[in-house]
Amino acid sequence: MSAPIVETKKASKRRIRRIPDDQRQKVSSACDNCKKRKFKCSGEKPCFECSKKGHDCTYTIIDKRSLRGERMAKLKQKKDNNEKQRELVNEQIAQSSIIHPQITPVLPVPEYANVTYQDSSHSTVSGNDSYHLSSSSSIPQNLPAIVLPDTLRDPNNRGILTPGSTPNSVSSESSVSNVCVPKSLQPLLSFPLENKNNLRHKSEEPDMDNNTNNVPKKGGISNQEGKSAILLVDKSGAFRYMGETSPLSVLYEARGIFYEYVGSTKLTEDLRGCPVTDKPLKITMKEAAPLPHPSERDVYIERFKVNINGAYFVFDMDKFYEEIVDKVYENPNSDLVQENRVLLYFVLAIGSTYKDFSERNPQAEKGAHYFESGRLILRDLVEDSAMWCVLCHYLQFHYYESILKKSTALVHLTAAINYAQSLGLHRNFVNEQFSKLTAEYEYRRKLFRSLYISDRISSVFIGRPLIINDYDWDDPARFKNTNASVLPLDFNSKCHIELTRICTLVGRIVANFYQDKMIDVKKTKNLAIQLRLWSKGLDPELAFGNVLNPSQISNNEDNGNTVILLGIHILHLWAVMLLSRPFFMFEAISKINPEMRKSFEEEEELSKQLCQAATKASILAIKLMNHYINTTFHEIKRMECYVIITCCFYASIILGITILNGTFEEAGYTENDLMNSLKDAQYILSQFSVCNKGAERYSEINLDLISALVNRHKGKEVKPVVDNWSCNLFNDFNFGDTSGQNDVQTMMDFQQFFVSSDLIQFEEITDGTSSLPFDYNNYNLFFGDKL
């Protein structure tokens, strides 16, 4: 007989609450009537519904979700206790850090508190304000501040200081608490100076009215509480970012160095930017503006040719008239010519704008009307990825750059490059399909070279990522000398190829130094060799001497080839500055903090030569641009100046730091020589400042830099500078109509031998990772991520 089957029932497991009961939050609270009728209860006694209908309002079911009020009261009490404990600790630190009244500070001691201005000497943040460079000191300060309690912080302060949010007053209580901080509490990204006597006298701290905010005084340039940020806000308040390769990044570092040497000056305190709204223009027109009379049209097209097409190839001008201008003027309203009509309007807009600039008319209203007309027509067209789309966005890029909308311009440059890549302009085997049509083949290659040049110049000048990858473009002309080309090339095409090769080297410098966070000595030597080899293998027709003698340049009736040749040599000198900049800044900071030098003793001679190369390149670039301004510029009135003003400003900052730390004596020139170069830079920038807000602001900053250098010796005995070098290469070095062959040879020698051959052997040019990488102290503070 089988055993009876017994049914077993699984015992139900009780669900375990993941959150303890005392930490559960209230979801709802309702009386019995509202729960029964599923009405929304106000939770009061009596509730709204019961009061309205006269029911008895009772709460018989109480769960722990209804006890949130008691729990929150306990949490608030706990938070208040923590605040009192924190204030007590700060008070104890303040009492233990009282300084003897006889100690005086050697250098101003900044305190890094992120607080709000009370009485700013500069403009405050507003919609009509110029955008502000939130420029922070890359130089470490002796005594970083203790972080204020949350109750003392401005709730609207988000950590981005502008002149409108920089403090200028101090409370006696908070200032005392910031006098002495142990090393262990110093921020990670700071250079602790070992001079313990650099302490602030308590009696030197100004008192503050009790009714004002208790905020500590801000000294120097803010480092955003340990973050090294290049942050911009344009006139409308839109946020923009400038990266490590931009001149504003160099200015940011220079302000910190000047603060350490000179203290608070207008250079370190005036953080204004350019009053530009960097956004696309709105379309307000209902119909396009009429095309200008042919005679007026030809003037605008000529201005476009001089300012843009000579250096940044866009059109073959003969075909431009034949295929675009003539057809559009025959029947402007035909559906077959609307794409060409858009291109013509954009060309007229650029030409008209630069014509007004040459006449010192910064408004350029006619150019704005033509540009808006082109965009109005473009709005009704379909961008079909044809060649006209590449040209359309490339022309918009040039127009926005002319009115200083750099971020907006870069957006259109990106679109133009994407369309060009979709057409295969970056692939040699695709372009070779047009080999039977030689003109089309060369046009495609030259247009993509222009896009590449614009990418390398514009992206690097504002510190943005490069758009075109070198591995993705297989044009063989980038890696061969111009005289090795199969097809015969005119002078402008040769210059175009060499300009592309220089831009390739600039891209490699950026990739090797400013994308990585490690300086590689072997890569530095490799890039120095490549810069030297470029100069050594340059076609004699394109040599530096021809810039000084435009009459010897072929096909140069309108001086267009002089401009592109000038651009080649200026960018080569700027590439030397860019290559040398990390070493130059390292040497400048090492003067303040000698302990840093111990991290780089093995390659000290290389670093020294690169620093001198940065100074020499800056001097030569300014002299070369000054010669151009005094000669060719007055003849052609070319107002496109992005390369000139950026390199000029970059060079002036390098010379200012050179004067400040006294390294000019080792290089063989006097302070007076460098000051004259700074004055030349001021003259160059002033030529474009009327119609270019960027040049105007650069000019103001350069004046502040000169003023800070001149006034730094006030109250001190100025020691005369003695030049002990037997060969003073750059004294009385001047380019002019009577310049001798020695001056030209000096320039050519520098381009080929800016670093000694004893330190760099040509066999070191092989690729590969270096076995001697080194990391500068606080590298992230200067060249790392700045957000």
UniProtKB/Swiss-Prot annotation:
Do you know what upregulates this one?
Induced during biofilm formation.
Where does this polypeptide localize?
Nucleus
Signal peptide coordinates: none
Q: What is an example of a Pfam family matching this protein?
A: Zn_clus
Q: What does the record list as GO biological process? A: cell adhesion; cellular response to starvation; DNA-templated transcription; filamentous growth; filamentous growth of a population of unicellular organisms in response to biotic stimulus; filamentous growth of a population of unicellular organisms in response to starvation; positive regulation of cell adhesion involved in single-species biofilm formation; positive regulation of cell-substrate adhesion
Q: Which Gene3D superfamilies does this one have?
A: Zn(2)-C6 fungal-type DNA-binding domain
SMART domains from the UniProt entry: Fungal_trans (SM00906), GAL4 (SM00066)
Q: Which SUPFAM superfamilies does this chain map to? A: Zn2/Cys6 DNA-binding domain
In the UniProt record, does the keyword Nucleotide-binding occur? no
Name the predominant localization. nucleus
Q: Where is this region: Disordered?
A: 1-22, 120-140, 200-221
Q: Which GO terms describe its cellular component?
A: nucleus
Q: Which residues form a coiled coil?
A: 69-97
Residues in the DNA-binding region are: 31-57
Bias (Polar residues) = 209-221
Which GO molecular function terms does the record list? DNA-binding transcription factor activity, RNA polymerase II-specific; sequence-specific DNA binding; zinc ion binding
- Sorted UniProt keywords: Cell adhesion, Coiled coil, DNA-binding, Metal-binding, Nucleus, Transcription, Transcription regulation, Zinc
- What role does it play? Transcription factor involved in yeast cell adherence to silicone substrate, filamentous growth, and biofilm formation.
Name it: Filamentous growth regulator 27
Q: What organism is the protein native to? A: Candida albicans (strain SC5314 / ATCC MYA-2876)
